[in-house]
Design a protein with these regions (language model features):
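Phosphate-handling DNA/RNA-contact segment within nucleic-acid enzymes
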Residues: 2-94
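TOPRIM fold recognition
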Residues: 64-178
């Protein structure tokens, strides 16, 4: 809390005990930074869906449930969330266990480069699911109805890891400087 004002954010756990943390003003993590791997119970799955961030994974779940509320098929595959394209090398060994990999990466330079890197390694096993939202930066923009031409500039991170204390501080107001 800062000046007796509470702040909140949604946190998404990763494999190293850290959290990806988001709110309207903040995008960061509570260290350590790592991927998130969601494995289904029971028999190992042949399919894995790969997302750049959890703000792409959550819209995927929403779209699946909205399109088919009776049978959204959420447990027929595992999920890997990179939490940053810089974590791409960390998922390659995990992805070798799957016969099919659905790639829901962003339609920007970083997302396309990551896709091409994976395509070189996994070939036809990698399926480009970003074609479903090709006129949008990512699945979240698709769900919100914000085409690429209307999409806000992505948040630029100078640091991958920010402290939880810094997360609790609201952003500084910035006005027009002349």
């Amino acid at each position: 809390m800062n000046a007796d004002k509470p702040y909140f954010a949604i946190g998404f756990p990763n494999m190293a005990g850290g959290y990806e943390v988001r709110n309207r003003y903040f995008k960061g993590c509570v260290a350590p930074k790592e991927i998130s791997h969601i494995r289904q119970q029971g028999e190992p799955r042949n399919m894995c869906y790969l997302f750049e961030g959890f703000m792409d994974y959550l819209p995927f779940l929403t779209i699946r449930i909205k399109n088919n509320p009776q049978y959204p098929r959420l447990t027929t595959q595992d999920y890997i969330i990179l939490n940053s394209v810089s974590n791409l090398a960390k998922v390659e060994s995990l992805l070798t266990n799957y016969t099919q990999i659905g790639s829901f990466l962003d339609n920007d330079t970083a997302g396309r480069n990551a896709y091409e890197t994976l395509k070189a390694k996994f070939g036809e096993r990698l399926l480009d699911k970003s074609l479903y939202y090709r006129d949008y930066k990512d699945l979240n923009d698709y769900l919100c109805g914000k085409p690429l031409s209307q999409s806000a500039e992505p948040i630029k991170q100078e640091k991958q890891v920010q402290s939880a204390r810094r997360m609790m501080q609201p952003p500084k107001k910035r006005g027009l400087k002349m």
